[in-house]
């Protein structure tokens, strides 16, 4: 990876950010149908900031197979995990083609699958078998907890219990459902505001395994809250591809929503004096970023 454009000036603020291949601080993007050229442009600009690439719901069913294979090959070469949206697997389940689905996903070049029951009922034994089936076909299983219908939403503890069970059965990560709207689903109310009590319940029940959750958070206020709660290396999903750099700036404290707290903390601790005359200094002498570390380094929610 080449040096970033402003490293010589603000390189210190990036200290603490996990680097690829990341086990935490994942960014999962949703792709509704990017072509090869657009995908290449995105990877040139922000490829090292993307960890998971989801071809959302059933969109990949309409892409020419050779184009999809080339696209997935390019993404995999960059170390990005690729998978079709869970709704496509749910359709295959309804039509009795789930094993064929796994075989075909692997043949096309996907490296993972999303296993969900957002639309259909899925008994626990079938959920467990799907996780095993994915592994048997060389695919990394990523499950999703939650329902897409705003009128039928499971409680926070139910989401956490299912996530823990999925991880025990072999899921590598568990995504918390929010859809692409981020409203009226899961941990968000009808206006897209975070239900803080729900996040607290899930976090408490998950314990250290909360780091295996990918919180779908398509809206800026949701991303801000989760970064403030869990630190810059929280796993976030359903990020529009055009918002990857904006999210990274939010993680690093390079946007108002997170930088304001960093500036206040530096002033409070005497590391920055608004009245002081600036002296010539090297990037290494600049104060670090006290507000955007892992929650394990500073305590969840402490900035």
Report the location of each language-model feature:
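Conserved N-terminal beta1-alpha1 strand-loop-helix module at the mouth
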Residues: 1-70
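C-terminal alpha-helical cap/extension of soluble enzyme domains
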Residues: 3-16, 200-303
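Hydrophobic faces of well-ordered beta-strands that scaffold small-molecule active sites
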Residues: 24-31, 51-55, 82-86, 113-115, ...
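Active-site-proximal loop/turn and secondary-structure-junction residues that shape catalytic pockets
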Residues: 32-34, 57-61, 86-90, 117-121, ...
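Short, acidic/polar
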Residues: 33-46, 93-104, 156-165
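Generic structural signal for hydrophobic
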Residues: 42-46, 75, 104-108, 134, ...
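Glycine-rich phosphate-binding active-site loops on the catalytic face of alpha/beta enzymes
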Residues: 57, 108, 112-119, 167-183, ...
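Active-site-adjacent beta->alpha loops and helix N-cap segments on the catalytic face
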Residues: 61-74, 91-100, 118-139, 152-155, ...
């Amino acid at each position: 990876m080449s040096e970033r454009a402003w490293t010589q000036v603000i390189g210190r603020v990036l200290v603490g950010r996990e680097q690829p291949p990341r086990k935490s601080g994942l960014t999962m993007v949703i792709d509704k149908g990017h072509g090869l050229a657009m995908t290449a442009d995105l990877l040139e600009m922000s490829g090292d900031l993307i960890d998971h690439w989801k071809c959302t719901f059933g969109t990949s069913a309409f892409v020419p197979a050779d184009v999809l294979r080339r696209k997935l090959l390019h993404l995999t070469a960059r170390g990005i995990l690729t998978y079709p949206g869970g709704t496509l697997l749910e359709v295959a389940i309804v039509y009795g083609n789930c094993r064929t689905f796994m075989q075909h996903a692997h043949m096309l070049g996907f490296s993972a699958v999303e296993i969900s029951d957002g639309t259909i009922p899925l008994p626990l034994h079938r959920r467990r078998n799907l996780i095993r089936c994915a592994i048997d076909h060389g695919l990394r299983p990523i499950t999703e907890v939650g329902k897409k219908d705003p009128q039928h939403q499971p409680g926070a503890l139910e989401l956490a219990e299912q996530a823990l069970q999925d991880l025990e059965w072999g899921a590598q990560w568990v995504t918390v459902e929010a859809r692409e709207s981020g409203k009226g689903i899961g941990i968000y109310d009808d206006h897209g505001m975070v239900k803080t009590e729900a996040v607290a319940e899930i976090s408490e029940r998950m314990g250290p395994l909360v780091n295996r959750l990918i919180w779908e958070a398509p809206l800026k206020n949701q991303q801000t809250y989760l970064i403030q709660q869990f630190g810059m290396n929280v796993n976030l999903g359903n990020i529009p591809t055009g918002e990857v750099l904006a999210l990274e700036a939010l993680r690093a404290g390079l946007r108002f929503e997170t930088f304001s707290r960093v500036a206040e903390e530096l002033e409070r601790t005497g590391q920055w004096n608004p009245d002081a005359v600036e002296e010539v200094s090297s990037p290494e002498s600049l104060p670090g970023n006290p507000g955007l570390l892992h929650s394990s380094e500073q305590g969840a929610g402490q900035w």
